[in-house]
Curated annotation (Swiss-Prot):
May play a role in bone differentiation and matrix mineralization. May play a role in neural development. The keyword Transcription regulation does not apply. The lineage of its organism: Eukaryota, Metazoa, Chordata, Craniata, Vertebrata. This is von Willebrand factor C domain-containing protein 2-like. Pfam families: VWC2L_1st, VWC2L_2nd, VWC2L_C. Its main location: secreted.
Length: 223
């Protein structure tokens, strides 16, 4: 058995030498090295400067060609210096516009508010309404509400009352005034007691009544 050992050792040494890392250099795998360098670098696009233009989607346009870039609805022209795009002065959108479309180069109002809002309710253009007994309102064409508040006349009595659905106070018993603590009707003389006769001032209901007190004896007027 002894004479065969040296031959086995020689075979093992030969195999180790064949797979030694030190024996493999970069020049042995040029294709793999190039692939690795390409993977580590960013993808390089063709340079179209002075030759054409590229939009956001990667489409190439020739010099002088008109196109619409992805980020804008305004047309552009491809030049040697790059895209030159139209930038028109767009008209202002109406402040009452409720629907705006951006399909064209300029935004366009497609629907204008055609009603008025007042105290949580909506009204048609030119519609008249009364939000309260004392107000008369109308929805104007400019979508604004114009109201007029009733200008009530001064009541000619000291005890006016407010009726439901009526704006201004009324004197249910007609004009009157105070004679002391007593309310007397206007226009006539009123005997407030056995010795006193009172009369309201004509048209001046807020003034105390004019009273004439006669001479009395034991609470009875003397003639």
């Amino acid at each position: 058995m002894g004479p065969f050992l040296p031959a086995i050792c020689v075979v093992l040494l030969a195999l180790n030498a064949a797979v030694s890392p030190a024996s493999v250099g970069p020049e042995d795998y040029p294709a793999a090295d190039e692939a690795e360098r390409t993977a580590n670098n960013d993808i390089i696009f063709d340079d179209y400067r002075g030759k054409g233009c590229v939009d956001d989607s990667g489409f190439v346009y020739k010099l002088g060609e008109r196109f619409f870039p992805g980020h804008s609805n305004c047309p552009c022209v491809c030049t040697e210096d790059g895209p030159v795009c139209d930038q028109p002065e767009c008209p202002k959108i109406h402040p009452k516009c409720t629907k705006v479309e951006h399909n064209g180069c300029c935004p366009e109002c497609k629907e204008v508010k055609n009603f008025c809002e007042y105290r949580g309710k909506t009204y048609k253009i030119l519609e008249e309404f009364k939000p309260s007994p004392c107000e008369w309102c109308r929805c104007e064409p400019n979508n604004e509400v114009h109201c007029v508040v009733a200008d009530c006349a001064v009541p000619e009595c000291v005890n006016p009352v407010y009726e439901p659905e009526q704006c201004c106070p009324i004197c249910k018993n007609g004009p009157n005034c105070f004679a002391g603590t007593t309310i007397i009707p206007a226009g006539i003389e009123v005997k407030v007691d056995d010795c006193t006769i009172c009369r309201c001032h004509s048209g001046d209901w807020w003034k105390p009544a004019q009273c004439l007190r006669r001479e009395c004896l034991n609470g009875q007027a003397t003639s």
